[in-house]
């Protein structure tokens, strides 16, 4: 197990390194000069002053040297300073934003797992019934709906028209922190984030349950007179969860992409909104730092997903 963990960790580090190189190259290919982010458009600067500022920031060095310098600082935990917020470090900005994003993703995935697994089991147990057809149609709609469209529609219906949920933010301005207020702001973004993932989980769960229900050991349990409830819970559910665990692990990356759109629509103060603002203002250190942290989180979750196999099914050995 330890050897497997080290092997996957090394692969993850390689993927993370490749990701940072790709983002660095793409940023260099974008039009414009990074030095423009430092210059006040209302203040005239001579070419000599701009060259001096470029040299001070290290932007006059070759690109490989710039990347290696950034990577060396990143390994030590120093991701640099924001170009737009001169007194704030990138690490500090990420630390203040990663909590809301993790909260949103955890709530959204929890809702998706509960809804997806429950409806998938019901559809499989009651195959070709009205609930099965209904859940299948809803799952198809959920899979087909883009995250940004679902977010805008949810915001319009539940916030603008029905007034059931706040229109944005994480807390009500000028009020003390309270759990009920946080949950009111969290409910709609988390529900919107969960729709597509719940639909995918439902489809996978239904297919896996149908396959498992036709196994010989399930027929044997039924022949022995075991109640259908215990056949599903004790003999079927655990084995049927294996492909679903794979899907849940892979949806973490999709949830990051969905969270970026949802945070921008609902003005949720998380990593997605930070990354969008950094792209709009060409804040390169923030873009690189946020990408590094998001990529690391996705890779760690994928490793934990692989290790979860051995917990769910002890017959599976990791090597």
UniProtKB/Swiss-Prot annotation:
Location of the ABC transmembrane type-1 domain: 98-305
Membrane topology, from the record: Multi-pass membrane protein
Main location, first listed in the record: membrane
Compartments (UniProt record): Cell inner membrane
One GO biological process term: transmembrane transport
Keyword Cell membrane included in the entry's annotation: yes
The keyword Transmembrane helix appears for this protein: yes
Keywords: Cell inner membrane, Cell membrane, Membrane, Peptide transport, Protein transport, Transmembrane, Transmembrane helix, Transport
Annotated TM spans: 9-29, 102-122, 138-158, 182-202, 242-262, 284-304
Family matches, as Pfam families: BPD_transp_1, BPD_transp_1_N
UniProt feature coiled coil, ranges: none
GO cellular component: plasma membrane
Protein origin, superkingdom: Bacteria
Job description of the protein: Probably part of an ABC transporter complex that could be involved in peptide import. Probably responsible for the translocation of the substrate across the membrane.
Name of this protein: Putative peptide permease protein BOV_A0351
Species of provenance: Brucella ovis (strain ATCC 25840 / 63/290 / NCTC 10512)
Organism ancestry: Bacteria, Pseudomonadati, Pseudomonadota, Alphaproteobacteria, Hyphomicrobiales
């Amino acid at each position: 197990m330890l050897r497997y963990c080290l092997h996957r960790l090394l692969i993850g580090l390689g993927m993370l390194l490749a990701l940072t190189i790709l983002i660095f190259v793409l940023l260099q290919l974008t039009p414009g000069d990074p030095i423009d982010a430092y210059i006040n458009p209302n203040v005239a600067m001579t070419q000599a002053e701009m060259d001096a500022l470029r040299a001070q920031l290290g932007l006059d060095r070759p690109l490989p040297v710039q990347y290696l310098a950034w990577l060396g600082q990143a390994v030590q935990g120093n991701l640099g300073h924001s170009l737009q917020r001169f007194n704030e470090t990138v690490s500090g900005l990420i630390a203040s934003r990663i909590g809301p994003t993790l909260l949103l993703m955890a709530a959204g995935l929890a809702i998706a797992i509960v809804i997806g697994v429950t409806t998938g089991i019901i559809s499989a147990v009651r195959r070709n019934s009205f609930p099965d057809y209904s859940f299948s149609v809803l799952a198809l709609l959920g899979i087909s709906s883009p995250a940004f469209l679902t977010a805008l529609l949810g915001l319009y219906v539940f916030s603008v028209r029905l007034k059931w949920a706040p229109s944005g933010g994480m807390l009500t301005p000028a009020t003390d922190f309270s759990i009920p207020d946080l949950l009111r702001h969290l409910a709609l973004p988390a529900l919107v984030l969960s729709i597509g993932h719940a639909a995918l989980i439902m489809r996978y769960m239904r297919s896996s349950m149908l396959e498992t229900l036709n196994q010989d050991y399930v027929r044997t349990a039924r022949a022995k007179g075991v109640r259908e409830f215990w056949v599903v819970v004790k003999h079927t559910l655990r084995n049927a969860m294996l492909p679903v665990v794979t899907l849940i692990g892979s949806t973490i990356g999709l949830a990051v992409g969905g969270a970026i759109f949802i945070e921008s629509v609902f003005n949720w103060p998380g990593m997605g909104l930070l990354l969008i603002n950094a792209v709009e203002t060409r804040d390169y250190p923030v873009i690189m730092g946020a990408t590094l942290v998001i990529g690391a989180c996705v890779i760690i979750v994928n490793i934990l997903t692989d290790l979860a196999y051995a917990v769910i099914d002890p017959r599976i050995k990791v090597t």
